[in-house]
Amino acid sequence: MVIVALTGMPAAGKGEVAEIAQQRGWAVHRIGDLVWEETERRGLELAPSSVGTVANGEREAHGYGIWAERSLPCINALRTDGKHVLIDGMRGEKELAVFRDAYGDTLVTVAVLALSETRLERVQQRDRVDDGDAAAFHARDQRELGWSLAETIEAAAKTLENNGSLSQLRENADALLEQLESR
């Protein structure tokens, strides 16, 4: 069994890779779902500013690995079926450290890479509550880079380029996941 921690900038294509993993029978845990749940629990709207405030506030209050720590019970529950697991949305070095401590050699980090212009186009085309406009997109990029996201992307063991078509990403992601399944 392998555990993949997926990282990348917003709208790079992590969700698409997670969907492909699910189609292959992998279990998927999306870290962002925990942030959304906490935002809703506080009675806040799922808007870019409130989701970002909650994510950042929890990191400042409890440490930058907090969302990974809160993810461990969910991930461990998914592992009981013996399935491969994909963690969607690892955001920084502290989260990576939590996952490495928990899963050791079974963990493989994968970065999904896409140009800023490509990602902005995708944000403007998709209908996600936490995306917002171009200004919100750039603010989110800066906020997430402040969580050491760039360093986490650079440290990834594997990369998936996603500046082409969706079918190209699907083909490349499928091939990478197949390769990781045979580890």
Residue ranges and their predicted role:
Residues 1-4:
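Extreme N-terminal starter segment of soluble prokaryotic enzymes
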Residues 9, 21:
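P-loop (Walker A) phosphate-binding loop of NTP-binding proteins
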Residues 12:
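ATP-binding Walker
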Residues 88-89, 102-130:
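Conserved phosphate-donor/acceptor-positioning beta-strand/loop module used by diverse small-molecule
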Residues 65, 125-179, 183:
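Small-molecule kinase domains that catalyze NTP-dependent phosphoryl transfer to phosphate-bearing small molecules
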Residues 28, 109, 158-161:
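Short, well-ordered beta-strand core segments
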Residues 27-98:
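ATP-dependent small-molecule kinase phosphotransfer cores
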Residues 15:
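Walker A/P-loop
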